[in-house]
Amino acid sequence: MSLQSLYKSVYHRIVGDLPAYINELRAEIFKNGKTFFLGSLLQRTAKRYPDNVALICVDKKITYKDLYYRALRLSELLIERGIRPHDRVFLFLENSIEFYIGYYGIVQMGAVVVPLNTFLKEVELTHILNDAKPVLIITSADKVEHFRSMPAVVTLPILTEQDMRLDEPIPVQLPDFKVHELDSDELIALLYTSGTTGLPKGVMLSSRNCMTNAFQIVSCMQLHHTERILGVLPLFHSFTQSTCVWAVLFMGCTVVLVPKIERRYILGALQHKPTFFLGIPALFGLICLMKNAPLDSVKYFFSGGDALPDRIRCAFELVYRRKLCNGYGLTEASPVIAVDFEDEAGPTNTIGRPVLGVSCEIRDDHGKVLPQGEIGALWVKGDNVMLGYYNAPEQTAKVIKDGWLDTGDLAYIDAKGKIVITGRLKDLIINKGFNIYPQEIENVLMSHPAVIRAGVVGKAADMEGEVPVAFVQVSKVDPGLEKTLRDLCMQHLAMYKVPREFIITTHELAVTATGKIDKKVLRKQLK
């Protein structure tokens, strides 16, 4: 069977298995060639599930009816302040009910929401300000002074949660508000990437992109209005937006928000008995260390955002006797591309099959589609693929060709039609003409019980091109550990893949805001 035929059979099998309510939802969202407008989503859900609890955050709760009214009042305030459709509005808030009010207050009056990474420094924020040219910033009161100290913000109006009229009583009968609907393919959300390869790039998403991926998640997870989703990851992250800001609203689910990734907040949120737990590998590692976290109510655990180490997967299954579902995506695809739900054993870097409506190809350097089992660049296509990079047509042209997106990841398709990620193309190390995939080395290093984190990067070598160097984080430095790790690599890897240098430290390795090892920083440390 050809790869294309294999995907078609998987696609039709999934569609055929969808419950009736999912197919009804699909008919509602994708009607007459037009996609449901993101800005109308909260209004729709507030009418359909007015009394459902939309959000729980520590000791606060809000229903969909009340959330919609708060967002409606913010939309009116933005219009009063002169904000117009298509204007860019920055949203710089941590996980909170106010984030949702800000998000939907922006999009339902037709403006473009720009959710910002709250960990960004002034240099990165200034770059984004100059690139996106927002007309207004919504942030918390304690961040106003920080923004005002930046030259690029001196004249920009700033709203805080104090301007959201949160003390205003909710009327019994909600007032009418005419959502300013944009075309399905117009820009509605501008998400800046974490900048692991340079300054952040603005990923342009349309309603079609957002609603397509939200529906793909609903159909994949088969959500009902009774579900409770544990929202631990930052809301500025594309995965959290797709799952906890868009998808849940289709069904009127409840999001249990964790304001910060701290033990007390996680344990507090678990008291609300969530049914879905979404996280990154490092978070599940933390849950393993807790040993007795109350997880009985959770039906599915999803790990994404980074490669899932065998050690964390096995530890989680051993401690809690539950399976971690592995997933894969990137902001440029809104972001979810594939999910591995099945219970069968397989390598951790297996990310499953594409979600509904996504096509995948493995290509060589010349664009030729490779047969099953061969490693190449992973390309994806679907209505969830971004419009492009903001103000960067040349960069867009490099990654999108004929509707296909180059993910930048190396992968192959196994015999069951599942995608197996082998590493990042940009992280590829070439030694004497041999390709070395850092993730392969990292997986070996992570199998040692003393290793907490491992990151491998290439170092220039005159006669060899590049050689691998391993950064290893441990809790305690053992004098014989370097030899042990070298022997471990020699046992499992070809000699040219064995790191020439081991940098072992008890200090935390640099990570991005989404928890991935920041290899840009590791390369700088080498220099």
Language-model region placement:
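Conserved pre-ATP/AMP-binding loop-to-beta segment of ANL
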Residues: 50, 95, 173-192, 199, ...
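Structural core segment of the AMP-binding/adenylate-forming
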Residues: 1-9, 14, 43, 80-81, ...
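AMP-binding/adenylate-forming catalytic core of the ANL superfamily
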Residues: 120, 137, 382, 387-388, ...
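Conserved AMP-binding/adenylate-forming core of the ANL superfamily
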Residues: 30-35, 43, 51-96, 100-104, ...
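Conserved AMP-binding/adenylation subdomain of ANL enzymes
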Residues: 211-228, 235-276, 285, 290-291
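Conserved AMP-binding A3 loop
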Residues: 63-65, 188-215, 340
